[in-house]
Structures are given as structure tokens and as C-alpha cells.
A protein has these predicted regions:
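Conserved alpha-helix/loop element of class I SAM-dependent methyltransferases that forms part
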Residues: 110-128
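Conserved SAM-binding loop of SAM-dependent methyltransferases across substrates and taxa
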Residues: 137-149
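S-adenosyl-L-methionine
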Residues: 155-199
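Conserved class I S-adenosyl-L-methionine
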Residues: 126-137, 153
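Class I S-adenosyl-L-methionine
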Residues: 243-280
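Conserved beta-strand signature within the Rossmann-like core of class I S-adenosyl-L-methionine
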Residues: 234-242
Length: 280
């Protein structure tokens, strides 16, 4: 899918742009790519210009929503197929996303992009072939690229999430020549596609599945056995579990994960908000 290169607005950015216009300024400087860079817009009374393209001023925008230019107007970065999937701004710049209102990335203490850096560091990706089971917005993959991974095999099941990646400037572009083909992104269900991955062909893995109630197959013994099969001995796996409430879910998911991974052939230790597993 082609990447979006136009401006992205959140409510605060719109307010700042309109305030500059109303104050009679001829220019406004700020970020129109969710804090990734700074730029300057030329202001006129009825329209404004950015990177040589003329746009109408955005209307009043909703909070917790990111807007992009669809060629006719500024619209929400969201889609509804089987679920409502939405790109959501954070105070850190790099956005998170939600599926039916459920936040898919941690944002309470730090940027989800920074959170990904800490987790990727656990598997020491430099020079390695990395399996990224649930690509999401691609922050794990981006951090693996930055850390010098030789190759990242990334899977994402949801087409709407892949579409969000084309809007999000923080998401890595698999087709960017600067990445030298190291990121291989596939639109596929990893619970099925992993059967096609060769034995002991992966040096390290990152597993950040949706919650158990959404994707129980990604917590199954069958899937963990496949992870053990494709990882070489000594290979590291970080598995995000979070801290689901046992009283509301009726399950101790982290304990279940640990038991199944050990049965599959991993040695475990707690790390961050998940487990770090070593292939025995």
C-alpha cells in the first residue's frame, strides 16, 4: 500500500494553526507528522500551504483522534470492517491504536515507540534474523532495524492495521530503500503461517499478541511448540503478557503462558511486562 505523505492533525495542532492565522501571522511552525519532525506552513485567510500543497483549514476536531487529508477533506484515521480500528494520539508523539476501544499498546508511562526499544533490547537483535509475530504499527520492527537486525520477518493479520501503518509516520516502511530489504512484512495470520517457517531458522523472536480473549490461538501450546521449533537453540523470545486481572478474566494468563512455554522447551524469566524465554 502507498504511504501517506500529507499532514496529520490532532486537536491541539489545529488549535495552534488557527490561533496563528487569527493573530495575523503569515507562517506557523510546528509538527504535522505527530512530533516526528518540525515544519513551516504558509498561512492565508481562507487556506494554508504545506510542502507546496494548498489545504483548507481543518474544522473543529474531536479529541483523541488523528485526522488526515483524503483528497477532499480532513477525516479520522479509522476504519470499521469487523471491528472499529483507530489510530490514537499520545502525549509522546508516536501514536497507539485501538480495536473496538481497547488500547493495543502501553502509553501510560512512556511512548509506545520507547517501550518497544526496551523490549527489543532484551532479544539483542543486532545481526540476527528476528521473527515479529504480530506486527501491529511496526514499532518492534522499527526498533529492530535501528538496532541492526539482519532481517525481520513480520506478520500482521488485520488489513486495517496495515492501512493505519501507511498513515503513521512512526511506522517503518518495508519498501523504503534505506532499509535494504531487511524488513519483510506479510499480511498473514501468523498462527497459520508459522508452519511454513523452517526449523531453527530464526535467531530471536518478539511475540506481542492481542489479549487472550481476542486471539487465544496465539497463546496455545500448538503455537508455542512452533515458536520452539523455528527458534535456534539459545535463541531469545520476548512474550508480552501484561497483567490481566484474574478476578475479571477468571484466568492467570501469565502463569498459563509460562507453563506452556516451559513445556515447549523454553527457560523463562520475568522481564518488563512479559517474559523473556531462552530456547533450550
Amino acid at each position: 500500500m502507498p504511504r501517506y505523505i500529507g499532514p496529520l492533525f490532532v486537536r491541539a495542532t489545529t488549535q495552534a494553526l488557527l490561533a496563528a492565522r487569527d493573530a495575523g501571522a503569515g507562517e506557523w511552525s510546528g509538527s504535522l507528522d505527530l512530533g516526528l519532525s518540525q515544519g513551516t506552513a504558509l498561512l492565508q485567510s481562507e487556506a494554508w500551504q504545506w510542502r507546496g500543497v494548498r489545504y483548507p483549514y481543518p474544522p473543529s476536531l474531536k479529541d483523541r483522534t488523528i485526522y488526515y487529508w483524503d483528497g477532499d477533506e480532513f477525516v479520522s484515521a479509522a476504519r470499521f470492517s469487523s471491528s472499529l480500528i483507530k489510530l490514537v494520539p499520545t502525549e509522546w508523539g508516536a501514536p497507539t491504536f485501538e480495536i473496538d476501544g481497547i488500547k493495543m499498546l502501553p502509553t501510560s508511562k512512556q511512548s509506545p515507540f520507547e517501550d518497544a526499544r526496551h523490549k527489543v533490547a532484551l532479544i539483542e537483535p543486532r545481526g540476527k534474523r528476528v521473527l515479529d509475530t504480530c506486527g501491529g504499527l511496526g514499532y518492534f520492527a522499527a526498533r529492530c532495524l535501528q538496532a541492526g537486525a539482519a532481517r525481520i520477518d513480520s506478520f500482521e493479520k488485520n488489513a486495517d492495521v496495515l492501512w493505519l501503518r501507511t498513515l503513521n509516520p512512526w511506522s517503518p516502511d518495508a519498501e523504503d530503500p534505506a532499509n535494504e530489504g531487511r524488513l519483510q512484512l506479510r499480511h498473514a495470520d501468523v498462527s497459520l503461517a508459522i508452519s511454513q517457517v523452517a526449523d531453527a531458522s530464526i535467531d530471536a523472536a518478539l511475540h506481542d499478541p492481542p489479549r487472550f480473549g481476542i486471539a487465544g490461538e496465539l497463546y496455545s501450546q500448538v503455537f508455542y511448540d512452533h515458536l520452539a521449533r523455528v527458534l535456534r537453540r539459545g535463541g531469545k523470545l520476548f512474550h508480552y503478557t501484561g497483567s490481566p486481572n484474574k478476578l475479571t478474566t477468571g484466568r492467570d494468563v501469565p502463569r498459563e503462558v509460562a507453563k506452556r512455554l516451559e513445556k515447549a522447551g523454553f527457560k523463562l524469566q520475568l522481564a518488563l511486562d512479559g517474559v523473556l524465554a531462552l530456547r533450550r
